[in-house]
Amino acid sequence: DISGGDLDNTILPYLDYERIASVKKQFCGYSDLTTIINAIYAKTQKVPVLYPIRNLLYEYSAQQKEDFIKTCFAKDLNNIINNDAVKMMEKNNLYDLSVENSGLYQFPYKFYQGKTVEGIVVGGNIRCFLKIAGTEYFQDVKDKILLLEARSGNTAQIVTYFAQIEQLGVFKKVKGIFIGTFTKMKSKKQVLT
């Protein structure tokens, strides 16, 4: 069982990266699967999808499913469905297959520097991301966008994780940083300064 992110790095040597690279599917996951997601990218250059699949099961799941399909499979859908039919549906605003209009990209955010960022997102759960630091499973972060989040961890733990990322030189290499939710700190109203 690799749930909770505690043991996921123990299976990395046993994954068949050549086979993963050859399959025409994307690996989807989030948080607890951070180690595996980043290892797959480092070893195959195949960009995984950082997405909490559980969203497809909860409240607003119908909308989440539609947004997920539009975002991840729009190209495949356009190839499968008669293009004239797709154009007609889009023209009549019945179904928009453009990724830019996907609800997956509609969330509140705030820029602290600059006004836009575009690129490949790496990272995920900060603790799980750091478990692969210094290994062959840690990808080149140059010009990537770093996503960091955590469910657990008090302020001291999170500060330590950020310090380690800084000491690895990651912050100087990435072109952007997404700070996600740090759930335990948020619930206790703790703030990083």
Predicted regions and their residues:
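Short glycine-rich anion-binding loops that position phosphate/pyrophosphate groups of nucleotides
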Residues: 4-6, 153, 182-183
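Structural motif
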Residues: 1, 28, 145-149, 178
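Oxyanion-binding "anion nests"
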Residues: 120-158
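N-terminal small/polar loop signature for handling phosphorylated ligands or for N-terminal nucleophile
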Residues: 1-23
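Short, acidic/small-residue loops that bind anionic groups at enzyme active sites
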Residues: 15-40, 47-54
